[in-house]
UniProtKB/Swiss-Prot annotation:
Family indicated by similarity: Belongs to the universal ribosomal protein uS2 family.
Pfam families to which the protein is assigned, alphabetical: Ribosomal_S2 (PF00318)
GO CC annotation, single: cytosolic small ribosomal subunit
Lineage, broadest ranks: Bacteria, Pseudomonadati, Thermodesulfobacteriota, Desulfovibrionia, Desulfovibrionales
GO molecular function: structural constituent of ribosome
Recorded name of the encoding gene: rpsB
Species this protein is from: Nitratidesulfovibrio vulgaris (strain DSM 19637 / Miyazaki F) (Desulfovibrio vulgaris)
Protein name: Small ribosomal subunit protein uS2
Length: 271
């Protein structure tokens, strides 16, 4: 299992929180102290809590679940899109559309529209329309792609959400909580940890710190996927062995006992 070490966290500035005046008192248990007006996060706790979050991600994917990565702030967008794509998971890096999860049926209609437009441009069907209409459809497709591109293959709700900066992504947090979707989140000193199921106390503003955590969660997804495939392969192998095993011959029915020959009848001699 590829856990993140304290050395990696120190090198990427995970321990730097927000200014002391911009904090949520509920984060007090995860704060080591303050330096130059900046809260310093207790990395011993971060190391331990990251392992718990990592294992949750692995377990989710092992059991066939999918993870949605959410990070719409500028510092997180590239890392979230690249790493979620590498792991074969879903992601949202542009604006979080209200109802993305709680009104998923409507979102699916928009996804269907996006796929239809992509198909029209791919096979040339769009060329039947006038230039003005083509430009309108291009703008529509670009807009849908920006907001839904990372979830266009999501045909059901995810089983886990990984969020960078839950304070910023408060609408996504509310939707996950309403639907009972567990949340793993990089939680800075200005966040409310009570809203998060698996807190990773850490800097959610520094690009290097964000990349470290996002890549590690993507690795956890890949690890879970590999374990799931291995388990599936073993199950298939067991089924083949069972199918190939010779069936036990049915027990032979006991032959009926032979009847004893009848004793000859001796007639009494006449006197």
């Amino acid at each position: 299992m590829a856990y993140v070490s304290m050395k990696q966290m120190l090198e990427t500035g995970v321990h730097f929180g927000h200014q002391t005046r911009r904090w949520n008192p509920k984060m007090r248990p995860f704060i080591f102290g303050a330096r130059n007006g900046i809260h310093i996060i207790d990395l011993q706790q971060t190391v331990k809590l990251f392992r718990t979050a990592h294992d949750k991600v692995v377990d989710t994917v092992v059991n066939g679940g999918k993870v949605v990565f959410i990070g719409t702030k500028r510092q997180a967008q590239e890392a979230v899109a690249v790493e979620a794509g590498r792991a074969g998971q879903f992601y949202v890096t542009n604006r979080w559309m209200g109802g993305t999860l709680t009104n998923f049926t409507t979102i699916q209609k928009s996804i269907d529209r996006l796929k239809k437009l992509e198909a029209m441009f791919a096979d040339g069907t769009v060329n039947k329309y006038q230039k003005k209409e083509i430009l309108r459809m291009q703008r529509e497709m670009d807009k849908l792609l920006a907001t839904l591109g990372g979830i266009k293959e999501m045909d059901r709700l995810p089983q886990l959400a990984f969020i960078v900066d839950p304070h910023r992504e408060d609408i996504a947090v509310k939707e996950c909580r309403k639907l009972g979707i567990p949340i793993v989140a990089v939680t800075d000193t200005n966040c409310d940890p009570d809203l998060i199921d698996f807190v990773i106390p850490g800097n959610d503003d520094a690009i290097r710190a964000i990349k470290l955590f996002v890549a590690a969660i993507a690795d956890a997804c890949l690890e879970g996927d590999a374990m799931r495939k291995e388990r599936k392969g073993k199950d298939a192998e067991e089924e083949l062995k069972k199918a190939a095993a010779p069936k036990a011959a049915p027990a032979a029915e006991a032959a009926p006992a032979a009847e004893a020959p009848a004793a000859p009848v001796v007639e009494a001699a006449a006197e």
